[in-house]
């Protein structure tokens, strides 16, 4: 039987974002068109072995500046929705997920493009994006059905 009072989840960052963005810049975010650095803590650097074989990555990060949440929110493109039907940073578990393009790796420093996160944002995990697992036929994207080539 599930008992939420007994379960505690503790996540530790594996690194952080460096990109010079400190304040929100509107929608669409210009962050996505600028390179960002992900600095991986030295004790995790060996985990980057063979990561450069992947063109795209999924970055899981913490919305560390978000304070509180509402179960319904107004989104810029989709109107009012439940928080789980949105990309809002104001969530019960403040985790973000973005697919980014890997531009380069130098020691423990990744350069990526497409990361919509502030400078100093804690990175919780990095995973290779694998298209055959990421694409789904008939998935709705921004309210429209798109067909996958996978």
Task: For the regions a language model picked out, list residue spans one by one.
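Glycine-rich, low-complexity intrinsically disordered segments
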Residues: 1-150
